[in-house]
Amino acid sequence: MPPLILASSSPYRRELLARLQLPFSVQSPNIDESPQLGEAPEHTALRLAQAKARKVAETFPNALIIGCDQVATLDGLQLGKPLTHDNAVRQLTLMRGRSVVFHSALCVYNALTQEMQADVVPYTVKFRDLSDRQIESYLQKEQPYQCAGSAKSEGLGIAIIAAMQGDDPNALIGLPLIRLIDMLASQGVDVI
């Protein structure tokens, strides 16, 4: 098996990949993550996942590289990482009582053969109708400023969620494991 590399700085994606009990390393790709003008959210996520994998391939030309990215959308509006407290307040205020689709893009790039498999796995979350006090309390406790849509379902964020719908709950955290297992199998990597 070629070296397996996760092209991500996310500790949550690292934890998810570790569940598969495969040896892997982590590299943080340094790319511009800005959406392009008029770009559909799922295309933004897919483009960034692929760009991250290709960036890491520049340094590791014999590796099997996993790239991923996530973009949240509310009625077509892209909700990226808030980065600041004020932006997170704005996002959660906008999202309260509404449904948000998280587009989790995944690619597996074989740097040696230059074969790339890619997909976007959507996951829908309906948020509770939170008060301003609840939003502030959540943000003070969780500080999800590096998470698309200002929510971390793997932590206290589950308390601000009313319902979830999708094929793979791991997609909400940012790494669709069910689809990843299929992609790895097509590269000769069996998880079990």
UniProtKB/Swiss-Prot annotation:
UniProt entry keywords in alphabetical sequence: Cytoplasm, Hydrolase, Nucleotide metabolism
GO terms classed as biological process: nucleotide metabolic process
GO molecular function: nucleoside triphosphate diphosphatase activity
UniProt site positions, description: Important for substrate specificity: Y12, Q70, E154
Pfam family, one: Maf
Compartments, as annotated in UniProt: Cytoplasm
Highest taxon listed in the record's lineage: Bacteria
Record EC number: 3.6.1.-
InterPro entries in UniProt: ITPase-like_fam, Maf-like
Reported cofactor(s): a divalent metal cation
Gene Ontology CC: cytoplasm
Transmembrane regions: none
Catalyses which reaction(s): N(7)-methyl-GTP + H2O = N(7)-methyl-GMP + diphosphate + H(+)
Keyword Hydrolase annotated: yes
Record-annotated active site: D69
Protein family according to the UniProt entry: Belongs to the Maf family. YceF subfamily.
HAMAP family from the UniProt entry: Maf
NCBIfam families: maf (TIGR00172)
Role, per record: Nucleoside triphosphate pyrophosphatase that hydrolyzes 7-methyl-GTP (m(7)GTP). May have a dual role in cell division arrest and in preventing the incorporation of modified nucleotides into cellular nucleic acids.
Name of this protein: 7-methyl-GTP pyrophosphatase
UniProt organism field: Methylobacillus flagellatus (strain ATCC 51484 / DSM 6875 / VKM B-1610 / KT)
